[in-house]
């Protein structure tokens, strides 16, 4: 049935000349040009174009008007894909309509027939479609903000971030598939107004409870330290500070009124459904993620670990605690699920823990120690202050001399000894004059014995040693020569060497011996009264050169014989 076309005034807002399906668009819409005589410009242009070309251009402009608005470009990528699918479906319908219009034009039908739809109804339907598209853009922006908030809350834990991303991707794919399934059944629905269907909103109390549960469950991930030292050193105050700074705590601290003020439009309920899916995570996996890295042992457990390897105890670090050392057996207890007697083996070594705990600690054996006070005092004391047998200290006052291993006395001490000041302690003293005979005859100290050669001194002192009648008194030997620099010290060392060889260590015949400092040359000028004759004859006297030569030869020959004899004795001992 054909309806006669309605003529519109030139200044009206709508033109019904060339509109498909009765949908009219207002003139005040931006981005779409209207002519003075219709939808696409002047009547001259409409007359020059064929009806099929005019219809194709009209449908193309109608499809582009709703798909490329500035607000649509701000929307998400998925929404653009949906609008692209709609435009493609519209273009498909345009092609089909163009083919039908060509057939109708061939049959003599006019495509400029008026639409049966009322112009006001068409304008209202068009405005509703535009408003629905703007609401879709706003809701998608809110969804993007919610996903960004969830990613920031899960930023402290990579595991939580992966779980949240995977769940969000699954839910988004499900929504996308449902939308495509709903929009695919028929192509005739493209002319209907696209109205965004709001999701069913659950009660507000359930969303608040879900947010609180989500915040408490994710608290373990956000507060988990990144390393074991941070975990051990983290205090209660530090944990409170981290909780206050976390975005999850800030979001959960909002009051119900503040949350009600925020227009969630049901998208928080989607997040609640994702949280319910997290309940399917096994308890063991949740413990692995949220449990502390280091386990603290109780005192009872530390006491139970008693059996350790001795080698590990010996070579372990001193700062390492004993509880860290591995036990001898890898498994302290036998498995209870094996009751077959064939599989059970007898332990080769080791005692039960109860018997080992009852054992008393063994007494440690220390190094033996001598309790002899005298020997300890002798060994601990300085040997240089004791006489040869280490039994007593030196009686006479000593002075520093040329040889540090020998004891020197001054001429004044010699005079005190000659005058008998030490008679109560000294039973007998012997003054050994080591000079040559012509020197001794020229002048010597009273009661001195001339022993120029070592064999003579050995025969006189060691073949028939002098022994004290009273054990509390001492026997003292005093050696000197012209200067007490060479012959006197050499004779003193010789007598000590022979005395050591003749007695068991540390016993000696003559443990106390001295050297007269300065010799006879220094003693005679100071105390000539204790010399007889009171004269001094030097060793290199011109009248006694031959005697000096002879005694030197004897001394050297005897020294050579002694060295040869000692060498032969050493060879025989080997």
Curated annotation (Swiss-Prot):
Phosphorylated by BRSK1 in vitro. Phosphorylated by CHEK1, which inhibits the activity of this protein. Phosphorylation at Ser-349 by AURKA might locally participate in the control of the onset of mitosis. Phosphorylation by MELK at Ser-166 promotes localization to the centrosome and the spindle poles during mitosis. Phosphorylation at Ser-319 and Ser-370 by MAPK14 is required for binding to 14-3-3 proteins. Residues 31-51, 90-110, 339-359 are annotated as: Disordered. One of its GO terms (cellular component) is cytoplasm. Residues 90-105 have a biased composition (Low complexity). The active site is at 481. GO terms for molecular function: phosphoprotein phosphatase activity; protein kinase binding; protein tyrosine phosphatase activity. It is found in: Cytoplasm, Cytoskeleton, Microtubule organizing center, Centrosome; Cytoplasm, Cytoskeleton, Spindle pole. The modification Phosphoserine is found at residues 42, 166, 246, 319, 349, 370, 557. InterPro entries: MPI_Phosphatase, Rhodanese-like_dom, Rhodanese-like_dom_sf. Its main location: cytoplasm. The keyword Ligase does not apply. Interacts with MAPK14 and 14-3-3 proteins. Tyrosine protein phosphatase which functions as a dosage-dependent inducer of mitotic progression. Directly dephosphorylates CDK1 and stimulates its kinase activity. Required for G2/M phases of the cell cycle progression and abscission during cytokinesis in a ECT2-dependent manner. The three isoforms seem to have a different level of activity. Belongs to the MPI phosphatase family. This is M-phase inducer phosphatase 2. It comes from Rattus norvegicus. The gene is Cdc25b.
């Amino acid at each position: 049935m054909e309806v006669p076309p309605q003529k519109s005034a030139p200044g009206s807002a709508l033109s019904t000349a060339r509109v498909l399906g009765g949908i009219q668009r207002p003139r005040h819409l931006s981005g779409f040009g209207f002519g003075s005589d219709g939808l696409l410009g002047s009547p001259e242009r409409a007359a020059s174009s064929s009806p099929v070309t005019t219809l194709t251009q009209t449908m193309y402009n109608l499809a582009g008007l709703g798909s490329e608005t500035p607000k649509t470009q701000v929307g998400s990528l998925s929404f653009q894909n949906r609008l692209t699918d709609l435009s493609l479906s519209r273009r498909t319908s345009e092609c089909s309509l163009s083919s039908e219009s060509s057939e109708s034009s061939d049959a003599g039908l006019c495509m400029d027939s008026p639409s049966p739809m009322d112009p006001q109804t068409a304008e209202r339907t068009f405005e509703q479609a535009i408003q629905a598209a703007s609401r879709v853009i706003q809701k998608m922006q809110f969804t993007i903000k919610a996903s960004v908030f969830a990613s920031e809350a899960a930023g402290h834990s990579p595991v939580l971030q992966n779980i949240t991303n995977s769940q969000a991707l699954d839910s988004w794919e499900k929504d996308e598939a449902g939308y495509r399934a709903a929009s695919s059944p028929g192509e005739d629905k493209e002319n209907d107004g696209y109205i965004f269907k709001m999701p069913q909103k659950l009660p507000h109390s359930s969303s608040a409870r879900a947010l609180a549960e989500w915040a408490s469950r994710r608290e373990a991930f956000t507060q988990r330290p990144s390393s074991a030292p941070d975990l051990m050193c983290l205090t209660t105050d530090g944990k409170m500070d981290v909780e206050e700074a976390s975005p999850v705590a800030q979001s959960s601290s909002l009051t119900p009124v503040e949350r009600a003020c925020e227009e969630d439009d049901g998208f928080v309920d989607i997040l609640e459904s994702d949280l319910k899916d997290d309940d399917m995570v096994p308890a063991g996996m949740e413990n692995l993620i949220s449990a502390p890295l280091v386990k603290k042992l109780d005192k009872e457990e530390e006491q139970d670990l008693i059996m350790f390897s001795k080698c590990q105890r010996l070579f372990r670090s001193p700062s390492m605690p004993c509880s860290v050392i591995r036990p001898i057996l890898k498994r302290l207890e036998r498995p209870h699920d094996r009751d077959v007697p064939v599989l059970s083996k007898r332990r080769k070594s080791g005692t039960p823990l109860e018997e080992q705990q009852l054992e008393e600690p063994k007494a440690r054996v220390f190094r033996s120690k001598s309790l002899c006070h005298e020997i300890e005092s002798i060994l601990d004391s300085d040997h240089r202050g004791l006489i040869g047998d280490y039994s007593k200290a030196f009686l006479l006052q000593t002075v520093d001399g040329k040889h540090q291993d020998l004891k020197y006395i001054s001429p004044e001490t010699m005079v005190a000894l000659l005058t008998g000041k030490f008679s109560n302690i000294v039973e007998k003293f012997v003054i050994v004059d080591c000079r040559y005979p012509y020197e001794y005859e020229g002048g010597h100290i009273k009661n001195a014995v001339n022993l120029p050669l070592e064999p003579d001194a050995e025969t006189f002192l060691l073949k028939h040693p002098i022994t004290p009648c009273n054990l509390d008194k001492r026997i003292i030997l005093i050696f000197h020569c012209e200067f007490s620099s060479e012959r006197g010290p050499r004779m003193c060392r010789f007598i000590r060497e022979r005395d050591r060889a003749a007695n068991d260590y540390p016993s000696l015949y003559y443990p106390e011996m001295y050297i007269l400092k300065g010799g006879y040359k220094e003693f005679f000028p100071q105390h000539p009264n204790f010399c007889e004759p009171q004269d001094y004859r030097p060793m290199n006297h011109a009248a006694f050169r031959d005697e000096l030569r002879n005694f030197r030869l004897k001394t050297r020959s005897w020294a050579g014989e002694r060295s040869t004899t000692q060498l032969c004795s050493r060879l025989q001992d080997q």
